[in-house]
Amino acid sequence: MKQYKTVNNLIGWITFIIAATVYCMTIEPTASFWDCPEFITTGYKLEVGHPPGAPFFMLVANLFSQFASDASTVAKMVNYMSALMSGACILFLFWSITHLVRKLVITDENNITKGQLITVMGSGLVGALAYLSLIHISEPTRLQLIS
């Protein structure tokens, strides 16, 4: 079981690094269309925003905006924050998938075979990284359908 926890944590954090790197490489350096400028402004100035999850987002965005050298780089810092938080979402998705698959595949928690370990980790990795790629595919497709 200790080996499972070590491998699960290690692969989970590697998944986070992969996701956060991809998201950070593709951030917008300034404000873009839709609701992004509103989120950046409400996070920077701590003003009232309309989405339900806004208070947590605004507080974390304000924390990251404190690292901006001047007002022109606030948008980039908030976009980096969003990329890192999205990477954390992929991390927790990986851990959720491996937890569920472990309950389905492994019958004896004290005797985990290498095949079972590979099955559980592979399921989590495929599920988390498939979600990562779906986000990048769905947004351009949605924009193409609107225009």
Where are these regions (language model features)?
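Transmembrane-helix motifs of polytopic, lipid-linked glycan transferases
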Residues: W13, Y80-T113, I135-H136
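Loop-to-helix entry region of an early transmembrane alpha helix in multi-pass inner-membrane enzymes
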Residues: P55, A68-S96, L117, M121, ...
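Extracytoplasmic catalytic/substrate-binding loops of multi-pass membrane glycan-assembly enzymes
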Residues: I27-F39, G49-A61
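Start-transfer (signal-anchor) and selected internal transmembrane alpha helices
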Residues: M1-V22, A88-L91, L117-G124
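Membrane-water interface at transmembrane helix exits
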Residues: V22, I27, A61, S65, ...
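Single conserved hydrophobic/aromatic residue that forms the stacking wall/gate
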Residues: I135-S147
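Juxtamembrane segments of multi-pass membrane glycosylation machinery
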Residues: L46-P52, V60-L84, K103, L134-I135
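Short helix- or helix-capping micro-motifs
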Residues: G124-L132
